[in-house]
């Protein structure tokens, strides 16, 4: 189910009638007031005047309601700020040479494509992206995918990538200390001429997987007169203690926060989620609401909090918003659909494999709300004599007499004969090696990009440009949970083997 719309709209018949200048009231009978003669005539004239007045009032009310609704959905007065500056230590080694938002997902996309596509599909075309760590590949992808000439058209909007910088003075010699500090260091942007018409600032994360119409969120925020709105998920008992939870009153106003509570503290955070629009039966199963880390601030409120009220606070979720809830109007907004924080190797692995399930919990395939990425002009994949079940094969791949089960295979992947992949996420390659180059490598006893023949791989993430030789076995049969084998080209996190980018796994190796 999509995010709840808390509006109460006028029925279509009311709106249509008002626009046509027609009364919806049942016409008075000819003799409804008085009998014949003068009394009846006076009665009918009164009825007509009343009907006209009622129609005009209804038309004015509906017109005002429609104007307010249109104003609430005006995306030109919204700017999105996507936070992509975290070090991504929990996603290491995938973040060894790239920023978190640049991590590939779904075979052909990068994590940054999710909030960017949601912005485009929501009509929000003013976007700032704040980066700090390993931002080269992220910047390259954004320039290819979302520039004005060759990528997605942004009309009168803009996409600006802003890297953390140091400036003269003691205050200017530090990096981003958190989400709020990152925005504070660039708060001068909101005084710029480009921001003069901005009313609300949408704060997004660059490492979440979900599909959302942000303007539904913005509209709810504006119509309820919120200073800050927090997007939240309904959660059941089994998962509640893994999240930061919020407590709301019967109007949806946030009145308390608790970070990963347990026991009695957890029970104290139960709320009536029907207040936010959840059906009664589902509300009983999910009596908690968890913050998604997606926020809307009134621009002036945001600047006041960052500059004057909390000038040293570093984080929105744990510092500024909880401290502000008692002073200003902070509202919760329910998003009751698929959402995943891709913050760890395990969550990254499981989210990718869930794309290959039937039916998938999330799909990149949606004709009405597509996910965008950079144009690569790759040919269709060539698959020869292979068996593929419950898997995603991206474009530009070469598969020869192999077996692939419940896996995601990224762009430009090469998989040799008699290879068996199961529960594997293969990120693909950045470039092709020609047949001549591959032949020369093999003749010299070296390993070309891709997976060599007779190799068996299970429960594994294979980063880009990896060279895996013949007769290799990767299964972590000993059940090792954590291991760092940089010199051998792999790591193990949460029992999942990660073959490093550009690494070489020699023929016959068993992992």
Curated annotation (Swiss-Prot):
GO cellular component terms, A-Z: amyloplast; chloroplast
Main subcellular localisation: plastid
Top EC class, one word: transferase
Gene3D superfamilies found in the cross-reference section: Hexapeptide repeat proteins, Spore Coat Polysaccharide Biosynthesis Protein SpsA, Chain A
Alphabetic keyword roster: Allosteric enzyme, Amyloplast, ATP-binding, Chloroplast, Nucleotide-binding, Nucleotidyltransferase, Plastid, Starch biosynthesis, Transferase, Transit peptide
Molecular function terms, GO-annotated: ATP binding; glucose-1-phosphate adenylyltransferase activity
E.C. code: 2.7.7.27
Catalytic activity: alpha-D-glucose 1-phosphate + ATP + H(+) = ADP-alpha-D-glucose + diphosphate
InterPro entries registered for this protein in UniProt: ADP-Glc_PPase (IPR011831), ADP_Glu_pyroP_CS (IPR005836), NTP_transferase_dom (IPR005835), Nucleotide-diphossugar_trans (IPR029044), Trimer_LpxA-like_sf (IPR011004)
Pathway, per record: Glycan biosynthesis; starch biosynthesis
Regulation: Activated by 3'phosphoglycerate, inhibited by orthophosphate. Allosteric regulation.
One GO BP: starch biosynthetic process
Tissue specificity field: Expressed in leaves and stems.
Keyword Chloroplast among UniProt keywords: yes
Transit peptide feature range: 1-58
PANTHER family assigned: GLUCOSE-1-PHOSPHATE ADENYLYLTRANSFERASE LARGE SUBUNIT 1, CHLOROPLASTIC-RELATED, GLUCOSE-1-PHOSPHATE ADENYLYLTRANSFERASE-RELATED
Subunit structure: Heterotetramer composed of two small and two large subunits.
Assigned protein family: Belongs to the bacterial/plant glucose-1-phosphate adenylyltransferase family.
Reported function: Involved in synthesis of starch. Catalyzes the synthesis of ADP-glucose, a molecule that serves as an activated glycosyl donor for alpha-1,4-glucan synthesis. Essential for starch synthesis in leaf chloroplasts and endosperm amyloplasts.
Protein name: Glucose-1-phosphate adenylyltransferase large subunit 1, chloroplastic/amyloplastic
Protein encoded by which gene: AGPL1
């Amino acid at each position: 189910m999509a995010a709840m719309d808390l509006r109460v709209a006028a029925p279509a018949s009311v709106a249509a009638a008002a626009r046509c200048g027609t009364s919806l009231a049942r016409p008075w009978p000819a003799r409804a007031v008085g009998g014949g003669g003068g009394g009846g005539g006076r009665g009918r004239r009164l009825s007509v005047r009343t009907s006209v007045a009622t129609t005009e009032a209804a038309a004015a009310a509906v017109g005002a309601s429609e104007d307010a609704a249109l104003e609430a959905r005006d995306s030109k007065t919204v700017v999105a700020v996507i936070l992509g500056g975290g070090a991504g230590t929990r996603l290491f080694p995938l973040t060894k040479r790239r920023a978190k938002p640049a991590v590939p997902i779904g075979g052909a996309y990068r994590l940054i494509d999710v909030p960017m596509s949601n912005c485009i599909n929501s009509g929000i075309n003013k976007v700032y992206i704040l980066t700090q760590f390993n931002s080269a590949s992220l910047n390259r992808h954004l320039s290819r995918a979302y520039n004005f000439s060759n990528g997605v058209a942004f009309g009168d909007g803009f996409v600006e990538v802003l890297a953390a910088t140091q400036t003269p003075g003691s205050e200017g010699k530090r990096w981003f200390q958190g989400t709020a500090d990152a925005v504070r260091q660039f708060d001068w942007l909101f005084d710029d001429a480009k921001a003069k018409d901005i009313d609300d600032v949408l704060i997004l994360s660059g490492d979440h997987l979900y599909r959302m119409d942000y303007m539904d969120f913005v509209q709810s925020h504006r119509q309820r007169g919120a200073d800050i709105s927090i997007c939240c998920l309904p959660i059941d008992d089994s998962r509640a203690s893994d999240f930061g939870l919020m407590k709301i009153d019967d109007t949806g106003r946030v009145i308390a926060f608790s970070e990963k509570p347990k026991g009695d503290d957890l029970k104290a955070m139960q709320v009536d989620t029907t207040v936010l629009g959840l059906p009664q039966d589902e509300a009983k199963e999910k009596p908690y609401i968890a913050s998604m880390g997606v926020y809307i601030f009134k621009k002036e409120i945001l600047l006041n909090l960052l500059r004057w009220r909390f000038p040293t606070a570093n984080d929105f979720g744990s510092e500024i918003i909880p401290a502000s809830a008692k002073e200003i109007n902070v509202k919760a907004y329910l998003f009751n659909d698929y959402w995943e924080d891709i913050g760890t190797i395990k969550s990254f692995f499981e989210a990718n494999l869930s794309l290959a399930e039937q039916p998938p919990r999330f799909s990149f395939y949606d004709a009405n709300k597509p996910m965008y990425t950079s144009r690569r002009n790759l040919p269709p994949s060539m698959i020869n004599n292979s068996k593929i079940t419950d898997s995603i094969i991206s474009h530009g791949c070469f598969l020869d007499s192999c077996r692939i089960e419940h896996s995601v295979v990224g762009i430009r992947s090469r998989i040799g004969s008699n290879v068996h992949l199961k529960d594997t996420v293969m990120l693909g390659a950045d470039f092709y090696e020609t047949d001549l180059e591959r032949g020369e490598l093999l003749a010299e006893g070296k390993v070309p990009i891709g997976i060599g023949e007779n190799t068996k791989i299970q429960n594994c993430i294979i980063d880009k440009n990896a060279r895996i030789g013949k007769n290799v076995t990767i299964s972590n049969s000993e059940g090792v949970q954590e291991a760092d084998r940089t010199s051998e080209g792999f790591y193990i996190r949460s029992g999942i083997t990660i073959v490093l980018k550009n690494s070489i796994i020699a023929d016959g190796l068993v992992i």
